[in-house]
From Swiss-Prot:
This is Retinoblastoma-related protein. Residues 863-899 are annotated as: Disordered. Residues 723-853 are annotated as: Domain B. Residues 606-722 are annotated as: Spacer.
Length: 1005
């Protein structure tokens, strides 16, 4: 299809108002610019008319806020949704639709928008029009829309194209650098440019014809490396930017010839076995599509393969020769055009054309990757839960390439390939011993469950792809091979971490009987989901983005949040990128997903906070029962491989595995593993405590860790549900503290403001918990900032708060543009029937009426309080515990943030240290290794007080300016040498010196 011309801005003035005018502009956009037929126009107009009132309300929030740009955004959203969600009745309609269809890239070109900006603005359209799309296209509209998958695919292709361009530039010279060329090829200025384009088009053909529908980043990178091998073999050697004699880059076989594939694997961190398999597929694509005759590489006589081991290499006659290159490009272009008729909203050739006006140039995240490759600032603080590093992490290999998202993914895949893949696909002997030590042998149950759950996550048959009308046997076979490989990787990782957890539990409890842990259905599903998610994150799979593992295993975000910390803790070799992925995942769970409708957290909350039950039930937030293994197997249309039917679980009260009761759909447990090292400091627990959170978290007996949520805890005087909710709330407050601190630093606010905002957030979580229901915690944080600013008479507008929030690495525009409200209970004036409003309206009409009494209590002493808004005596009593008066100068209510880098600590703040409690020190350091450590509070010398140690350290740090001209090995107390002294001595050695120091002797103090 020919590229469409941009819309004429003079057709209808965008500043004109009125329904008729905007409808006319939309009609012209569809019919005049996109040449839509009448049926498609009618359907598009129907969706436009039903959502028009939402556009009129939110137009100023789209893009830069100009009327014309806002209209174009809305037009693009409407047409994209309509095209993706329209159901074709039969194959004839589908074929006709494909012939006359338009693609997303064509919509954006007409609207003069780019992909990056489109994907950034799309989420708020989805949030606001969700009910309309559900009514028109069914409840599964979001799954069929595949917006997140399309965005991830765009990000992956952006990264891959940059990766390919960088590698091509490294390997081959630009044609104008070839000054010695005598042939027609050398005289062609466009030859290398055409070869570059040929490589990308061949890669796209490989994606279409040879790869499975699971086009993950690792597989695609292997494909690109195979393309580079094809180019090296066939592009004349004079265009190379390297020499085969360079031993630092190439692996030589028998110290004579270069092993090309092994060398490329060494350069680009790919698996040699996988690369050789991919080379076979690439050669088949060249042979079948370009109709080239393959021959043994040893038969090549043009000198291209001199000094290269030709074993297992294929050479194609006249491939990449000047006389045939143009026709080969035409064939690949035609092949891709045919593929675009069947699937795809994105013309992937755009990435090689450098069409920045259509692609966009700013950053965009997709899945677990960011196009810019920059590390999020929040990662420097990691998760709200503590992460323990290990000497084995991160897993690195000596790479000569600069670090990019693609190279990082390949390094992570190498960990999976070298550490996990060699393991057994069955429980180890040690793990089997734990499984057999339960009240009954659960080995077969564990194996059977793992097979069913992983088959559900990685189905052999594959989930039907609406954009693919037919699949060949080859594609189905590749799908099954890919799924089987991922299942095995996840299974081996699951068994490995499960054994580490069992070993740790047995050491704590001094016994191998772990029945409560190993018979808990929800625990195992969470572990399997976590293992599968790490495998998916390693391969960067576009079609299976989080939370796919939650949906396919039948667990909720609240369930998964309980095992993430333990998983990280007990897999010491986990690469840094995967640790970061799990930490980022935990942030997503805590900030919003746990608060969504259907979260099992609400089932626990009804028991832990009975006063919230009515609101939870009224909003319909409770999670449904966790589906049985039989139901999961049936839903995936797969066989259990001859396994016996899964027995029905006992739903009687008090059973550890009960999952049927809606009130107790989540087995609320707190494993010793999760709690043992979390929030154990009494000071932190007092500052982070919510409601009746105890000042010290004790390790519960394993028998009660997985008991019914309503069962009383044996040592804490509270139910297991209360214990789980309190731990969850403590993580929420720690995450909020990190984000509040980031906003305070960005806006340069005082410590008093920071503490008041933090204190207010704590009180809302403990006393106005319902404000978090169906919302994002950042929405509450932003409102807390403005509320505190008003009560303290600080000159800070909501616009300034949002402006600074947009600069935060975790910012999402829909956070302040679409806040959930329930019109059935609110008394909003002029309500529009929306389920989501902007944050200022939420603040004025929902937040303030609920929080005003708490705000009044936070007012400074010089600000008079309104007696009508005094908090009840009960609330005052509750507040005095976890959140002391912010004016108190003795103890700050703001907690110490986790894993802070020394560079993150402001120089204007004093840093204090306190002695390490002997009980904690003994737990961390064994008797035999104490001599290797120096603990604050314990002297490093016999009969010497710790204060003298600190004094000595301070003297050394403060005395660095007193340096010596030469090192004196006879004295013990030798000062440190400054950088300036070293620099000066180097000048003197070179016979050069600053004028001020020329001829002067170095002083020794």
């Amino acid at each position: 299809m020919e590229d469409l011309q941009p819309i004429n801005p003079n057709t209808d003035s965008p500043t004109e108002t009125g329904a008729t005018t905007i409808e006319a502009r939309f009609s012209y956009f569809c019919k005049g610019r996109l040449t839509m037929d009448d049926n498609a126009l009618e359907e598009a107009m129907k969706l436009f008319n039903q959502s028009k009132h939402l556009f009129m309300t939110n137009a100023s929030a789209l893009g830069s806020g100009t009327p014309e740009e806002a209209e174009h955004y809305w037009f693009a959203f409407i047409l994209f949704s309509m095209k993706r969600l329209s159901k074709k009745n039969d194959a004839e309609d589908a074929a006709k639709s494909n012939e006359n269809s338009f693609k997303l890239y064509q919509i954006l070109r007409v609207a003069k928008l780019n992909f990056v900006d489109f994907f950034k603005e799309l989420p708020q359209f989805i949030v606001k029009t969700g009910p309309i799309l559900s009514n028109l296209y069914g409840s599964d509209w979001e799954t069929r829309l595949q917006a997140k998958e399309l965005q991830a695919n765009f990000v992956h292709l952006s990264l891959l194209s940059k990766y390919y361009k960088r590698a091509f530039k490294t390997l081959f010279k630009p044609s104008h650098d070839n000054v010695e060329g005598q042939s027609a090829v050398a005289n062609s200025a466009d030859y290398i440019s055409n070869c570059h384009r040929f490589g990308w088009l061949l890669f796209l053909a490989l994606r279409v014809h040879a790869f499975s529908r699971f086009k993950d980043l690792v597989t695609c990178t292997n494909g690109l490396v195979s393309i580079l091998a094809i180019l090296i073999i066939h592009i004349p050697a004079r265009f190379r930017n390297f020499s085969m004699s360079d031993s630092s880059h190439f692996v030589k076989k028998d110290d004579k010839v270069v092993d090309l594939l092994a060398s490329l694997c060494n350069m680009y961190e790919t698996s040699e076995d996988e690369l050789r398999k991919t080379m076979v597929r690439t050669n088949i694509v060249v042979e079948e599509i370009l109709k080239k005759d393959p021959s043994m590489a040893s038969e090549c006589t043009n000198g291209n393969l001199d000094n290269i081991d030709t074993d297992d290499l294929t050479y194609f006659q006249d491939l990449l020769e000047e006389q045939s290159l143009s026709s080969d490009l035409d064939i690949l272009e035609k092949d891709y055009d045919d593929a675009m008729l069947l699937e795809g909203e994105l013309d992937e050739r755009l990435f090689i054309n450098d069409e920045e006006s259509l692609l966009g140039s700013s950053s965009l995240s997709g899945g677990a990757i960011n196009m810019t490759g920059t590390k999020r600032k929040i990662d420097s603080m990691t998760s709200p839960t503590k992460t323990i590093t290990s000497p084995l992490s991160p897993y690195k290999s000596p790479s000569k390439m600069i670090s990019t998202p693609v190279s990082t993914a390949m390094t992570t895949a190498k960990w999976l390939r070298t550490v996990v893949s060699p393991l057994s696909s069955f429980p180890s002997v040690d793990l089997t011993r734990f499984l057999q030590s339960c009240d009954k042998d659960v080995t077969s149950d564990v194996i059977k469950r793992a097979r069913i759950i992983l088959e559900a996550i990685f189905p052999s048959s594959g989930i039907p792809d609406r954009t693919v009308l037919s699949n060949t046997q080859t594609t189905n076979l590749m799908d099954n091979i890919w799924a089987e490989q991922r299942r095995l990787e996840a299974l081996k990782l699951y068994y490995r971490v499960l054994h580490a957890m069992c070993k740790a539990e047995s050491q704590i409890l001094h016994g191998n009987n772990l029945t409560s842990l190993l018979t808990n259905e929800r625990f195992h599903r969470c572990m399997l989901a976590c293992s599968a998610e790490l495998v998916l994150a390693t391969h960067k799979t576009v079609t299976m983005l989080f939370p796919a593992v939650l949906e396919r295993t039948g667990i909720t975000a609240f369930d998964l949040s309980k095992v993430i910390e333990s998983f990280i803790r007990h897999e010491e070799s986990l690469p840094r990128e995967l640790r970061r992925h799990l930490n980022s995942l935990e942030e997503r769970l805590l900030e919003s997903m746990v608060w969504e409708k259907g979260s099992s957290m609400y089932n626990s909350l009804t028991i832990a906070r009975p006063n919230l039950s009515n609101e939870i039930n009224r909003l319909g937030l409770l999670a449904g029962p966790m589906p049985s293994l039989d139901a999961i197997a049936l839903q995936c249309n797969m066989s259990c491989g001859g396994l016996p039917p899964v027995p029905k679980r006992d739903t009687s009260p008090g059973k550890s595995g009960e999952i049927r009761s809606p009130k107790r759909v989540c087995n609320e447990y707190r494993s010793v593993l999760v709690e043992r090292n979390s929030f154990t400091s009494p000071v932190k627990d007092r500052l982070l405590g919510i409601g009746n959170l105890k000042s010290k978290i004790l390790s519960p007996a394993l028998q009660s860790a997985f008991a019914s949520p309503t069962r009383p805890h044996p040592t804490r005087g509270e139910t297991c549900a209360e214990t789980a909710v309190n731990l969850f709330f403590s993580k929420i407050v720690k995450l909020a503290a990190v984000r509040i601190n980031g906003m305070v630093e960005r806006m340069q606010l005082t410590q008093q403001i920071r503490e008041r905002v933090y204190c207010l957030f704590q009180q809302i979580l403990g006393q106005r918990t319902s404000l978090f229901f169906n919302r994002h915690i950042d929405q509450i944080i932003l409102c807390c900032f403005y509320g505190v600013a008003k009560i303290t008479q600080l000159s800070l507008t909501f616009k300034e708060i949002i402006f600074n929030y947009r600069k935060q690495p975790h910012c999402k525009p829909q956070v302040f543009r679409a806040v959930f409200v329930d019109d059935r209970s609110s008394s909003r004036r002029g309500k529009t029937g929306q389920d989501h409003v902007d944050i200022i309206m939420f603040y004025n009409e929902i937040f303030i009426p609920s929080v005003k009494p708490l705000l009044v209590e936070l007012a400074p002493s010089n600000v008079p309080k309104n007696p009508n808004n005094q908090v009840s005596e009960t609330n005052k009593k509750d507040e005095s515990g976890p959140c002391p008066c912010p004016g108190s100068p003795k103890v700050s209510s703001f907690p110490s943030l986790p894993d802070m880098s020394p560079k993150k600590v402001s120089a204007v703040h004093n840093v204090y240290v306190s002695p390490l409690r002997s009980t904690k020190m003994d737990a961390l350091i064994s008797h035999g290794s104490k001599s290797y450590y120096a603990c604050v509070g314990e002297s490093t010398h016999a009969y010497q007080s710790p204060s003298k140690d600190l004094t000595a350290i301070n003297n050394r740090l403060n005395g660095t300016r007193k340096v010596r001209g030469s090192l004196n090995f006879d004295e013990v107390d030798v000062g440190l040498v400054s950088d300036s002294l070293v620099s000066q001595s180097l000048y003197l050695q070179n016979g050069k010196g600053p004028a001020s120091s020329s001829g002067q002797e170095l002083k020794t103090e």
